[in-house]
């Protein structure tokens, strides 16, 4: 079981509150019940953290003197402080709920998934998003933290939904005028192969609309086009439409988004025949025996 993080009380500047909220995402682990959805859920947390850090960079929160004090004078800065305090309280509330759950849970249900359990594409995205955030936020020395866990989908959705809402509120107070440019930079810092972009697109849904939109546009304008106008095949034949990546190719990000077109007007597949309309990255494909 993960231990909860403890907070050293005391007055903090608005900037320190912001940095603490960003850092708090890094101490959340997910329980085994997330199973096959683990990668998407972990990336959702990463994207929520990245979006918060993006707002902080746009607001210049670590350099603007208005945010360097614990009792800001202007109205907007006080509103920012209030939102960040609510986000901080959300982390604390869910941590307490997890602690309560752990009291009666059997040991097996307290097993945790690890970043090492992720496949190469998702693990690489997690690492690169984390690196982006570390460039934007500062480490806080006011807090002693250890890892804690979310064990069920209900509290996970509560965290993501409410945290996203709080960032929405922050963006209304300090709009991210160059959000598109910052997102473009983020995408350039991750591998722009199709599997990575599709993983980002799935995880960004309902969490980061700007990121989801930019990824969708890149996929639409740069991805492979694979097409069969008419297909006739029997039960024994095997037909694959679409590009495929070997495990090693996924790990190295092989698969350029330079547009390719693979088209067939008419395909007849019979017996033990194998047909693949698309690109194959990294050597042997799914039909290679």
Specify the residue positions occupied by each region the protein language model found:
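Short hydrophobic membrane-inserting alpha-helices and related fusion/pore-forming segments
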Residues: 1-13
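Regulatory helix-to-disordered linker/tail regions at the edges of structured cores
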Residues: 85-88, 92, 108-289
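Conserved, well-structured core segments
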Residues: 10, 16, 148
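Charge-rich, amphipathic alpha-helical segments
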Residues: 17-142
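Long amphipathic alpha-helical coiled-coil
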Residues: 9-12, 39-42, 46-49, 167, ...
